[in-house]
């Protein structure tokens, strides 16, 4: 690797594990993702943090949750779902193709909806929606009482925020972690 390259990643593994897992989408021209792919057991990486604040607030575990993610933005929700299996939650995961879905079998079809925007729209054991998460939200209004957590690219976050607000979800019930 050589030089210091900074990137922000969200922890994928739950706190109960004795190892740290992150999801990294390999970008063809990407410096860091390409180098991470070449890492071998025993290679040294410098990690700083955590710096985010995504968590289930005390006293809210009995409420209904809506997790909305695109791509590797599913990371915090995977961690939250494994750490809090009792949550009444639904996860919308927006991807271009089924190969980009991560561990969907952990959630069950009643709690997981894959929103696939590309032309390949088949995946076994998954509830599929043909289109983006934003289109799904427009067609399936969200109850204003849901706690909504969003993670992914900024365009999706801002658009989902506006849709959730139009459904009557107050800003105090919308939490976001923006990737880029």
List each language-model region with its residue ranges.
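Ferredoxin-reductase
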Residues: 1-41
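FNR/FR-type flavoprotein reductase catalytic core
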Residues: 31-180
């Amino acid at each position: 690797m050589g030089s210091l390259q900074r990137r922000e990643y969200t922890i994928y593994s739950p706190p109960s594990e004795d190892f740290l897992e992150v999801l990294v989408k390999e970008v063809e021209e990407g410096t860091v993702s390409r180098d991470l792919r070449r890492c071998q057991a025993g290679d040294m990486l410098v990690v700083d943090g955590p710096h985010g604040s995504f968590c289930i607030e005390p006293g809210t575990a009995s409420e209904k949750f809506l997790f909305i993610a695109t791509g590797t933005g599913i990371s915090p929700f995977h961690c939250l779902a494994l750490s809090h299996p009792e949550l009444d939650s639904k996860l919308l995961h927006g991807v271009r193709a089924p190969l980009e879905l991560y561990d969907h079998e952990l959630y069950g079809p009643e709690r997981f909806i894959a929103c696939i925007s590309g032309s390949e729209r088949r995946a076994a054991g998954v509830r599929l929606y043909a289109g983006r998460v934003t289109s799904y939200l427009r067609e399936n209004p969200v109850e204003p009482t849901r706690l909504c957590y969003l993670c992914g690219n900024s365009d999706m976050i801002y658009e989902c925020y506006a849709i959730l607000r139009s459904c009557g979800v107050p800003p105090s019930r919308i939490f976001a972690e923006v990737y880029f």
